[in-house]
């Protein structure tokens, strides 16, 4: 259980931060990890997982080590990373150094734990002093708190030391309490690791345990933590470039929508204009035909109202050479009817002649509507 707790906390707190640009003389103990064509700080730090130092040189060479330089940065890092030109990956004789503080603190805490494991009191004191700096000390303090024993009601904290006896149920409860506190601690670390901060990492765990004579136990856990997660230059640049690309894509989509809307409106207006133009043309055509018909009728009436010249005949005399036939049909009582044909001939320049009529008398055999024998 202690190993699992230490592993989870170590994974949450492990993160490389940029330390500075150092010359090759100011840093030692480095081992070349790889030379990557698309090198970046994030790729190199992934390759150096488990080491305290990750260093980049010549734009594409990655080195790992465990010796953190203590001097001030004195190098000149002007070479851009081959995989991410927005950040620098060392120079011709300088390293861009990134440090994993959790790995450095793990080494310090393990040495402190081995030097103070002789007695229970010393272990408890060591766990109190190292709780704010490492996860290994948190597991050791949980172990020391589980060994506290008492037969009377008490109130203890992580920083206190007690050696009075208690029952085995309290020990199990203390172990459970420590695992709960470590779980809450890892959750807090996960949530805080998404933000960038410049404050130093620190965490404090306070466990208050109250035990009654009837082995009834009440535990209150207070966890306060502030973890610094410095975002590397590559991660910040990647986030900004992704945000700008997202904004550009959003702008293009809005422009496309606006273009579609404007095009639709213009197309509708064009169709409406063509329709109105066609209707206007049809109306003009109809008006022209009506005007032409009126002109023709007027000319015909004008020509018919004029007297034709004397002595003219034929087509040149207008309607004077026309012949009108009128057929009248009727029915009278007592006979089948009669047909009268009237012919009138217009002589040029004169009134019509007297009509020549031909009367057809019905056959008397059909008088009364019955045939006569």
Swiss-Prot record:
Domain of life assignment: Eukaryota
Cleavable signal peptide: none
InterPro entries (alphabetical): WSC_carb-bd
Pfam families, alphabetized: WSC
Annotated region (Disordered), positions in chain: 101-171, 183-210, 291-316
Segments forming domain WSC: 15-101
Biased composition (Low complexity): 110-171, 183-204
PANTHER family assigned: CELL WALL INTEGRITY AND STRESS RESPONSE COMPONENT 1 (PTHR16861:SF9), GLYCOPROTEIN 38 (PTHR16861)
Protein name (record): Uncharacterized protein in LEU2 3'region
Organism whose genome encodes this protein: Pichia angusta
Biological classification of the source: Eukaryota, Fungi, Dikarya, Ascomycota, Saccharomycotina
